[in-house]
Amino acid sequence: NGSAQGSKSDNWEVEMATRYAKMGYVVASCDYRLGWNPLAGTQEERTLQLIQAAYRGVQDSRTAVRFFRKSAEEDGDPFGIDTEKVGLIGNGTGGYITLASSTIESYNDIILDDNGAPITKFWYDPGDGSYIPMVIEGIHGDPDATTDTYAPASVGGFQLCAANHVGYSSDINFQMNAGGALGDLN
């Protein structure tokens, strides 16, 4: 993937949203946090940044689901949604995010295999011969983005995950990948 950008207003997204809306569905085309450098100096750097960007996309898609459930319950349902029928559809990286959002149940799903052993392709060597996960829950947040987390003070201490709409379900009832990969977790 050499694309570090995309938008909720890209032609495909607008066309699909319009078609589904004409069929009576409530549609929201949502952006998610971008941010990886496809031209980073090493493959390891590019992989690390891409995995972290995909993780943020999962968090953002789940936060959007909670936003709509919260708006239905607390704000008089301004969008007219059925909170029991919430789905995700994505294309390209958005397709990857919809699949990951529907298959990752917990943080351990992205770092450990079914037997509890590290999924080594999602770990990296920071340069000292040790291996650490590419995504660290205490720094990057949980997969649902329901905890506030910050980068270490040594690299700025800025917020990486802001908990929003905590207490509402992030569950989706269906997902459709209209083009995009599925990360091989095992």
Where are these regions (language model features)?
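Glycine-rich His-Gly loop
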Residues: N1-S3, N91, G95, G180
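Solvent-exposed, polar/charged alpha-helical surfaces in well-ordered, non-transmembrane soluble domains
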Residues: V14, T18, K22, Q59-R66, ...
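Feature marks short, surface-exposed loop/turn motifs that line or immediately flank catalytic pockets
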Residues: L34-W36, G95, E105
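A short, hydrophobic beta-strand element of the alpha/beta-hydrolase
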Residues: M176-A178
